[in-house]
């Protein structure tokens, strides 16, 4: 969006949007620790949002800082931006991007099963179960090619290097989704640790 008159904006560490203005609070009453967390050392208010400023001065939000993670190479990744991009594909239903403190980015992907079954019919792929279908080499190759195209605008360190297809969707009932249908990253990391570790071998 456009910056309002009288408000200064700059981009800080981790691409955090920082603001300074007479209308911004000066701190929390009798809470010096909370105030120190909310402001930089030189008095800029931390919004908690990551983003950038365009050439014409507009602000673009990309993610919440708390949702960012850092690879072992020190690069910050905005997983939701990658998940949203991949989720645009008709063969991909859900995505959980992995990569916190790891060398590269991977993903657990839930295919859009109805679209996948149509593809399987067209290509005459024989399978006995959904588990078998997601392990099929032709299916994996097709998804891989589509991921490559979807990632074209990403920096090299943001690109998914490996992925795992799961035969079951993330659900609220299983605890893998919040009631607003956002993925619970910590639960997915724990529940699918074996599949995740296999992508880093």
Question: Would you name each region that the model predicts?
Answer:
Residues 3-71, 88:
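Conserved ATP-binding/catalytic segment of the ANL
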Residues 50, 89-115:
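C-terminal boundary motif of the adenylate-forming
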Residues 94-97, 144-201:
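Conserved C-terminal "lid"/linker of ANL adenylate-forming enzymes
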Residues 13-14, 33, 37, 80, ...:
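Solvent-exposed alpha-helical segments within well-ordered globular domains of core cellular machineries
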Residues 2-14, 22, 101-104, 111-123, ...:
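Conserved adenylate-forming
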């Amino acid at each position: 969006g456009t910056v309002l008159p009288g408000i200064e904006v700059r981009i800080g560490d981790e691409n955090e949007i920082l603001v300074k203005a007479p209308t911004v609070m000066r701190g929390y009453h009798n809470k010096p620790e909370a105030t120190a967390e909310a402001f930089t050392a030189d008095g800029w208010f931390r919004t908690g949002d990551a983003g950038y400023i365009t050439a014409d001065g507009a602000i673009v939000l990309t993610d919440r800082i708390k949702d960012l993670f850092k690879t072992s190479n020190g690069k910050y990744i905005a997983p939701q931006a990658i998940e949203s991009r991949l989720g645009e594909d008709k063969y991909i239903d859900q995505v959980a991007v992995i990569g916190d403190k790891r060398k590269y980015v991977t993903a657990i992907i839930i295919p859009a099963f109805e679209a996948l079954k149509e593809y399987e019919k067209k290509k005459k792929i024989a399978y006995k179960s959904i588990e078998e279908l997601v392990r099929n080499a032709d299916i994996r190759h097709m998804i891989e090619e589509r991921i490559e195209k979807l990632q074209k605008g990403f920096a090299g360190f943001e690109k998914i290097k490996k992925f795992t297809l799961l035969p079951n969707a993330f659900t609220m009932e299983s605890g893998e989704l919040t009631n607003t249908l956002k993925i619970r990253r910590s639960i997915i990391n724990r529940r699918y640790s074996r599949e995740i570790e296999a992508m880093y071998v």
